[in-house]
């Protein structure tokens, strides 16, 4: 899980979602692409 000021999709399978007011990126194919805005 990377914590970044600006989260971006890193591949075509990344999805940007908003959970409890926090923007996150989840990725099914590459778990290293997981990010959280912070």
UniProtKB/Swiss-Prot annotation:
Pfam families documented for this protein: Ribosomal_L36 (PF00444)
UniProt entry keywords in alphabetical sequence: Ribonucleoprotein, Ribosomal protein
Superkingdom to which the source organism belongs: Bacteria
Gene Ontology MF annotations: structural constituent of ribosome
A GO CC term assigned to this protein in UniProt: cytoplasm
GO biological process: one example: translation
Alphabetized NCBIfam families for the sequence: rpmJ_bact
Cited HAMAP family: Ribosomal_bL36 (MF_00251)
Record family assignment: Belongs to the bacterial ribosomal protein bL36 family.
Name of the molecule in the record: Large ribosomal subunit protein bL36
Organism in which the protein naturally occurs: Azotobacter vinelandii (strain DJ / ATCC BAA-1303)
Lineage summary: Bacteria, Pseudomonadati, Pseudomonadota, Gammaproteobacteria, Pseudomonadales
